[in-house]
Amino acid sequence: MSSLPLRTASAAVLLLGLTGCPTVDLGEEPPPPGLCRPDVGYYESVIWPEVINPAGQAFNCVSEGGCHERASGRSALRLIVANDLSAAEHSQNYATVTRFLNCGTPEASTFLTKPLTGVDPHGGGDLFDPGSTPEMLFFDWFAN
């Protein structure tokens, strides 16, 4: 008995499954894996307190019960939240956030496109508008 029909069927199923896989634009010259590491100091002093966890805002990425709080989060982007994060906790959060960056095409980073009004559907809703301070701070991160 020939295994050719079985191989053909397996290949067809594999190809069918692959057609639904999304693609990611990594830019003309994507950086090697693991090298998308914009300035960590800027992350700690600007991105964390002004974009991810701005004081006085009821809705942000990690507000109480927020989608991206590690303890109770409901998404792949889960961050440690504390009044005073230790250096190790900041480092862990930075490593998590950088998985959602696209250094070849920063404007395509899901870390930006999800909360940005009208770009990507986001379970937490739109958090900031194009041209707003959080978006500009994000782009400044790549310029540093």
List PLM regions with ranges.
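Aromatic- and Gly/Pro-enriched helix-to-coil junctions and flexible linker segments
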Residues: 21-144
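Sec-dependent bacterial lipoprotein signal peptides
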Residues: 1-21
